[in-house]
């Protein structure tokens, strides 16, 4: 394929939670093709589950070589910064991940679950007391993960407002200018530096105190400390908030879906996995990888130095892996979705996110069994110009 017939990517502006129909014929006929993103050089796009999983898991595709390069293909005005765990390869990535992983073990997540339940109950008390109609984004979807990750990091409650708007800005594709994104990231770095100083003076059992101790033992650089803090703070709430809001929207858009879970609450863990598979949460092209040597993938030879974007959204709708992939089957049993990525960069907080989603959904079903949208589905406003899809507001009644 020549440069003149390289396709533009992403494939048009999304409508609510629709997945662009262009992925299906690509998976069938051209599983790897050349695309041009809004910024950077042309790259390869892979769309089949098998190939996406391979790219995510193969060490010959480097995140580190893609970081901080203006030439790296991307959908954001500002290139992903170096020094973040998201933009490292082993062994640097392994060293940093090991420092953080102990806070996200299955045991620690299980131990935190009662606290998650307390947070959810308190938020739903406020929603119920305020009365219908209510905005479920402002009332539950956003404050829940903000509270959870803040408590894990040791962020004081009164500081939540300081990072919320900045974190939304750094995830911008078209909603903010490059200058605004750079300023927002600088503000987050300044705040994380202040928080680190505070934890150095008053250490606790939180994750930021542990990171500060590692920094002071020369196991973490200044930049790694702040960038890791930003990754945890932003990644720890934005994706979970968006996923929960999108999940409730889909359940209420078709009331029989809500009724199924209300009458069969034991299905909630299975339903959460299916919603993770079905919802195309992230924007295509968020994280490109650079081939460090020639690699064959999707029937093409990716040359050393060329970039690859792996579409997990497309992979999660691959009919080679999933029966009726475009059907939201809340009782689906075989579900090897890639919503949390794969390989060494698989989402560190996957178990934490699952726990939050399960607790919040179960509590919502129990507290408000008659929950329904307060406006027609087509009137729900959607976030625009961001790496993540989600309702801006989710008006509900009961």
Swiss-Prot record:
GO terms for biological process: antibiotic biosynthetic process. Pfam families: p450. SUPFAM superfamilies: Cytochrome P450. It comes from the Bacteria. Residues 63-90 are annotated as: Disordered. Disruption phenotype: Disruption of the gene abolishes nocardicin A production, and the mutant accumulates the biosynthetic intermediate nocardicin C. Keywords: Antibiotic biosynthesis, Heme, Iron, Metal-binding, Monooxygenase, Oxidoreductase. Its EC number is 1.14.15.43. It catalyses: nocardicin C + 4 reduced [2Fe-2S]-[ferredoxin] + 2 O2 + 2 H(+) = nocardicin A + 4 oxidized [2Fe-2S]-[ferredoxin] + 3 H2O. Its cofactor is heme. Pathway: Antibiotic biosynthesis. GO terms for molecular function: heme binding; iron ion binding; monooxygenase activity; oxidoreductase activity, acting on paired donors, with incorporation or reduction of molecular oxygen. Heme binds at residues 93, 97, 289, 345, 347. Transmembrane segments: none annotated. It is an enzyme of class 1 (oxidoreductase). The keyword Oxidoreductase applies. Belongs to the cytochrome P450 family. Involved in the biosynthesis of the beta-lactam antibiotic nocardicin A. Catalyzes the conversion of nocardicin C to nocardicin A. Cannot use nocardicin G. This is Nocardicin C N-oxygenase. It comes from Nocardia uniformis subsp. tsuyamanensis. The gene is nocL.
């Amino acid at each position: 394929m020549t440069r003149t017939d390289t396709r533009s990517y992403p494939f048009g502006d999304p409508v609510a939670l629709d997945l662009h129909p262009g992925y299906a014929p690509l998976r069938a006929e051209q599983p790897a093709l050349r695309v041009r993103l809004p910024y950077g050089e042309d790259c390869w796009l892979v769309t089949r589950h098998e190939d996406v999983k391979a790219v995510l898991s193969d060490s010959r595709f480097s995140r580190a070589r893609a970081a901080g390069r203006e030439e790296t293909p991307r959908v954001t005005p500002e290139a992903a910064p170096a020094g973040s765990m998201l933009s490292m390869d082993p062994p640097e990535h392994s060293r940093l991940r090991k420092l953080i992983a102990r806070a996200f073990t299955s045991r620690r997540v299980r131990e935190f679950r009662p606290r998650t339940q307390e947070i959810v109950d308190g938020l739903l008390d406020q929603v119920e007391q305020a009365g219908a109609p209510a905005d479920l984004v402002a009332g539950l979807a956003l404050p829940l993960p903000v509270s959870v990750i803040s408590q894990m990091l040791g962020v004081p409650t009164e500081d939540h407002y300081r990072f919320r708007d900045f974190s939304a800005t750094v995830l911008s594709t078209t909603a903010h200018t490059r200058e605004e994104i750079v300023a927002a990231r600088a503000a987050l770095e300044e705040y994380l530096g202040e928080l680190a100083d505070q934890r150095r003076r008053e250490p606790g059992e939180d994750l930021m105190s542990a990171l500060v101790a590692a920094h002071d033992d020369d196991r973490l650089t200044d930049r790694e400390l702040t960038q890791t803090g930003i990754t945890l703070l932003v990644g720890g709430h934005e994706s979970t908030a968006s996923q929960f809001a999108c999940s409730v929207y889909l359940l209420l858009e078709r009331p029989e879906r809500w009724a199924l879970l209300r009458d069969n609450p034991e299905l909630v863990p299975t339903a959460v996995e299916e919603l993770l598979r079905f919802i195309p949460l992230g924007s295509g092209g968020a994280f490109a990888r650079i081939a460090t040597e020639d690699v064959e993938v999707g029937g093409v030879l990716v040359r050393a130095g060329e970039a690859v974007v792996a579409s997990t959204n497309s992979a999660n709708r691959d009919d080679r892996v999933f029966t009726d992939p475009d059907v939201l089957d809340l009782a689906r049993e075989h579900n090897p979705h890639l919503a949390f990525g794969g390989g060494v960069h698989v989402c560190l907080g996957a178990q934490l996110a699952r726990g939050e989603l399960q607790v919040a959904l179960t509590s919502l079903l129990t507290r408000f069994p008659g929950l329904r949208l307060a406006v027609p589905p087509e009137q729900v406003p959607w976030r625009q110009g961001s790496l993540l899809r989600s309702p801006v507001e989710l008006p509900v009644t009961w």
